């Protein structure tokens, strides 16, 4: 944002988005009983119904810092819910002084609401009030003259759009940075006792699995609460993770094997030996694992249900070291070459066979990333000045042709938005993530993260 634009916003009383988000509103409702009637709190239960007729939503523009420079300012909207919620609180059973009867006492209570429930990129993104819930309902017995009280928490609805996060594994300070993809700012930093070296997000965006390559551990982050909820033991040096399209299983490459994790129980249920493999990829249907075998110079195909090697491409590759499959399609890209430069070959997954080679040779590739619709692939070479400046190659997968070659300085890993409009590039030497617009591959914002981000996922 230009300085004069920023000044105009500040003159219009635009403040920074610093009000804390809260979707919870606790309440306490005292209950008075008619003379001669009582309730036994040991057996009593409470019920609550509510009306949101007097509740409203407003969008308040505010400012966020989008980059390291003072003029790197953007506008977001604080979504504020305000007004009143009318509660009908009931307690039962209510009995007379002789212990007879099975009635109930109800009280109408009005709860004031005035709080920011989330920040949005656009105005008018109000929540659905029908999704309001009540949690932690509790009956508090009378105490020193105070009446019986029903306490609980109103939980206000989340954003109508699913929250989208970008995660970076920061090897320099053993943290994971969580970036709000709407705000393009870090909203949480999660510390670990072991170094995070790679990570992956389930397709339903519910969980992030963090690999600790210096140990034999995989940590699980709940993406709703952004907290670590479990640690799973696998083989030593876990280096890559992929998920089947149903999110039923996660596959972790470690110690010369694939460790199959049941995501419901978050436990290892099978181990598939993959001797000689330097890399692996799961087919789009989640039925087969394909490995780049640096020992036998082959691409091997394993059935994930039986763990058996079922097919191989042999005697056609020279030291295959990287393999990547798209989200949809019957092909994969294989980086191969014992020395430098190296080539990329397209293979057919079924039947397993070698296809054509890309005409361009590469120093090496750090990663190959596909767009969600699988129409684009992004080949990332190491960045080196002044010899290797244009280090990103954009591929039209239908034509197997490079359609762009641009510069992403210092990029070590990539994540592509589902609509293909932006690329998030992890830059470990700068402790930052740069967001590039794919229409012209210009940087639109720089996001400071933890030290040494070496892997990124969204």
From Swiss-Prot:
<dbReference type="InterPro" id="IPR051200">
    <property type="entry name" value="Host-pathogen_enzymatic-act"/>
</dbReference>
<dbReference type="InterPro" id="IPR015943">
    <property type="entry name" value="WD40/YVTN_repeat-like_dom_sf"/>
</dbReference>
<dbReference type="InterPro" id="IPR011045">
    <property type="entry name" value="N2O_reductase_N"/>
</dbReference>
<protein>
    <recommendedName>
        <fullName>Uncharacterized protein YwhL</fullName>
    </recommendedName>
</protein>
């Amino acid at each position: 944002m230009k300085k004069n634009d920023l000044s105009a916003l500040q003159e219009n009383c635009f403040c920074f988005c610093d009000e804390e988000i809260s979707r919870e509103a606790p309440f306490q409702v005292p209950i008075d009983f008619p003379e001669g009637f009582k309730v036994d709190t040991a057996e009593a239960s409470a019920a609550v119904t509510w009306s949101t007729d007097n509740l409203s939503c407003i969008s308040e523009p505010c400012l966020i810092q989008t980059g390291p420079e003072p003029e790197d300012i953007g506008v977001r909207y604080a979504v504020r819910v305000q007004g009143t919620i009318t509660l009908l609180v009931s307690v039962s059973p209510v009995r007379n002084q002789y212990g007879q009867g099975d009635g109930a006492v109800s009280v109408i209570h009005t709860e004031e609401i005035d709080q920011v429930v989330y920040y949005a990129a656009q105005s008018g993104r109000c929540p659905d009030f029908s999704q309001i819930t009540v949690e932690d309902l509790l009956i508090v017995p009378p105490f020193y003259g105070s009446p019986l009280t029903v306490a609980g928490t109103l939980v206000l609805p989340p954003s109508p759009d699913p929250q989208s996060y970008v995660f970076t594994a920061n090897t320099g300070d053993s943290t994971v940075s969580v970036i709000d993809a709407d705000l393009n700012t870090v909203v949480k930093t999660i510390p670990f006792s072991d170094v995070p070296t790679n990570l992956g997000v389930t397709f339903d965006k519910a969980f992030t699995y963090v690999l600790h390559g210096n140990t034999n551990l995989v940590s699980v982050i709940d993406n709703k609460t952004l907290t670590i909820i479990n640690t799973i033991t696998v083989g030593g040096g876990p280096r890559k993770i992929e998920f089947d399209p149903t999110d039923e299983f996660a596959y972790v490459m470690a110690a010369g094997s694939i460790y199959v994790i049941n995501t419901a129980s978050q436990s290892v249920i099978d181990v598939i030996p993959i001797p000689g493999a330097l890399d692996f990829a799961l087919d789009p249907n989640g039925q087969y694992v394909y490995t780049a075998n640096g020992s036998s110079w082959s691409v091997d195909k394993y059935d994930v249900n039986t763990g058996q090697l079922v097919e191989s491409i042999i005697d056609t590759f020279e030291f295959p070291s990287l393999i990547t499959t798209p989200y949809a399609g019957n092909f994969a890209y294989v980086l191969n070459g014992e020395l430098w430069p190296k080539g990329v070959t397209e293979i057919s997954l079924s039947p397993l066979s070698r296809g054509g080679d890309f005409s361009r040779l590469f120093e090496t590739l750090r990663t190959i990333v596909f767009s969600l619709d699988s129409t684009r692939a992004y080949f990332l070479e190491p960045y080196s000045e002044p010899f290797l400046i244009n280090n990103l190659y954009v591929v039209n997968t239908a034509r197997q042709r490079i359609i762009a070659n641009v510069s992403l300085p210092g990029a070590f890993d990539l994540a592509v938005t589902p609509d293909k409009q932006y690329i998030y590039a992890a830059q470990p030497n700068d402790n930052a993530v740069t967001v590039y617009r794919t229409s012209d591959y210009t940087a639109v914002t720089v996001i400071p993260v933890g030290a040494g981000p070496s892997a990124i996922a969204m």
